[in-house]
A protein has these predicted regions:
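Acidic, Mg2+-coordinating catalytic module of metal-dependent nucleases/exonucleases
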Residues: 183-207, 245-340
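Short helix/loop capping segments that flank catalytic or ligand/cofactor-binding pockets
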Residues: 105-108, 133-134, 199-200, 254-256, ...
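Extended, Lys/Arg-enriched charged tracts that mediate electrostatic binding to polyanionic substrates
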Residues: 76, 81, 87-107, 214-232, ...
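Conserved RNase H-like, two-metal-ion catalytic cores of nucleic-acid enzymes
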Residues: 3-40, 78, 82-188
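Conserved DEDDh/DEDDy metal-dependent 3′-5′ exonuclease domain
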Residues: 135-262
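Common nucleic-acid-contacting/processivity interface regions adjacent to the catalytic cores
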Residues: 285-402, 464, 470-478
């Protein structure tokens, strides 16, 4: 699984997850003969032999310092499986859950962009270890009590945690130790509303308020902007190259299918619904929690991070996010964009047909497209009601009617289609004389899905049989 592809003149630095769940790196040289992009070509004499654009037009190569998104996919194919296979093995990264607690003043919570209030503690969890980094002292007895409370609280999970507390003289020392000696080595860091608050707060607190250089969070000291949406408004946050920092709330909202009734997206509600375990309740204010009941403050912080890890094991939503990026062979964060995954997949399948997607310099205005038809229900009391749920309905329609981009002919309800053409009810006409790109891709993925379902069913049957054997042996022993 690829984390990031960082381009330097003449080479690629690629980070990926290895078989141990850690980050490894591959450097690939890009010879000058491969440093180009394709463009549409009107002069036959300049056209590249043997290649056409996806829509059947001539193309030419033009020099380029860096490979664009289509050329990257083509370059990996040209490099060969022997050089790139390890990049796309189905390896999952070690996950670390994180949660911060910030000083709350009479003005309330500080905004992450300003990060004007001190970070009081940081929880850091990967079973069996639960670290809390804090600013106040705790006795050995208090730490033992916190560990007991943690394990009592999450007893339903069947897990036990070892609690480790580290105290610091000041916030800067705490943040540096946490980031340099712990977070820097983690392949995947996540938390609840982590982009919108915790991570953005840590970054801005360090760089704007404490004047700390935390470029070391990236092995190459390179960072990039990532755009998030909060309440309909876009905001940019900074993320380090070659490390996955992911908001579990974001992937939960996008991909979770386990929690049926989503009344709200708070950690307390979701953990209760999925695990039957709630956050820690405290009757006072956050100020009182830190000032008067510091041991409960630390307990509260620790449980929040533990709940993230337990949710991931229960929901497995992170696997969906990471798996999508891997099977479509894009950088992990690109899995948030269906368009980027589709473009990468189309590029690979087209390239094997000697078709490419040229760089198009035309700028078009944004267009609106008609969505799927939804029948307007008529409110009433009915004696018979039926609900139909078709397996893979849209992919099946696209495969059946040969719907793709490169074989589209015209949209005209009066058009008379011949034997090698397919006309849909909307009047869209497609060339059916060959298997087009999108139906080929869908058939391939559909076949993989059926195979995966069969393997899953066989595993479930084997598990049930083993449970039965175990029960019979226990009864025999008794």
């Amino acid at each position: 699984m690829v984390l990031n592809i960082e381009q330097k003149p003449g080479r690629l630095i690629i980070s990926y997850i290895n078989t141990e769940g850690k980050v490894s790196y591959l450097q690939l040289n890009v010879p000058s003969s491969h440093q180009f992009s394709y463009v549409y070509c009107k002069q036959k004499s300049r056209a590249h032999p043997g290649l056409k654009s996806w829509d059947g037009k001539d193309v030419a190569r033009v020099p380029a310092q860096f490979l664009n998104k289509h050329r990257l996919q083509e370059f990996f194919i040209d490099a060969g499986e022997e050089h790139t296979k390890q990049l796309f093995d189905r390896n999952m990264p070690d996950l670390y859950a994180c949660d911060i607690e910030v000083d709350v003043t009479d003005e309330g919570f500080a905004e992450p962009e300003d990060a004007k209030n001190r970070i009081n503690s940081i929880a850091w969890v990967r079973h069996p270890d639960c670290y809390v980094f804090g600013l106040k002292p705790l006795s050995g007895e208090e730490c033992d009590q916190i560990e007991k409370k943690i394990n009592d609280h999450v007893k339903k999970s069947g897990k036990e945690y070892k609690f480790i507390y580290k105290q610091y003289k000041n916030e800067a020392d705490m943040l540096y130790d946490f980031l340099y000696n712990y977070a820097r080595h983690a392949p995947l860091i996540t938390g609840w509303f982590f982009w919108g608050y915790d991570w953005d707060y840590i970054y801005n607190r360090c760089t704007k308020r404490l004047n700390m250089d935390i470029s070391f969070m990236s092995p190459t000291s390179q960072w990039y902007e990532h755009t998030i949406k909060i309440k309909g408004k876009k905001r940019k946050i900074m993320l380090p190259y070659h490390k996955l920092i992911v908001d579990y709330l974001a992937i939960y909202k996008k991909w979770d299918r386990t929690v049926d009734v989503k009344e709200n997206d708070t950690l307390d509600f979701v953990s209760n619904a999925a695990l039957g375990i709630s956050k820690i309740k405290y009757p006072g204010t956050f100020q009182e929690l830190f000032n008067k009941d510091y041991d409960i403050h630390v307990f509260y912080n620790a449980v929040d991070a533990i709940l993230i890890e337990l949710l991931d094991e229960k929901l497995k939503t992170m696997n969906t996010f990471l798996g999508l990026g891997n099977i479509t062979r894009v950088e992990a964060m690109s899995a948030f964009s269906p368009i980027q995954m589709l473009e990468a997949t189309l590029t690979r399948y087209a390239y094997k047909r000697n078709q490419i997607f040229p760089k198009n310099f035309e700028r078009k205005e944004r267009e609106h497209f008609e969505g799927a038809f939804v029948y307007e229900p008529i409110p009433n009391l009915y004696e018979w009601v039926a609900a139909f749920d078709f397996a893979s309905l849209y992919p099946t329609i696209m495969r059946q009617w040969m719907i793709s981009i490169e074989n589209f002919i015209v949209k005209d309800k009066l058009f008379v289609a011949n034997n090698n053409q397919i006309k849909t009810s909307s009047g869209a006409v497609f060339d059916a004389s060959y298997e087009p790109l999108i139906p080929e891709i869908l058939s391939n993925y559909y076949g993989q899905r059926k195979k995966a379902k069969r393997i899953s069913q066989e595993a479930d049957m084997e598990f049930a049989e083993l449970k039965k054997i175990k029960k019979e042996r226990l009864n025999t022993t008794i």
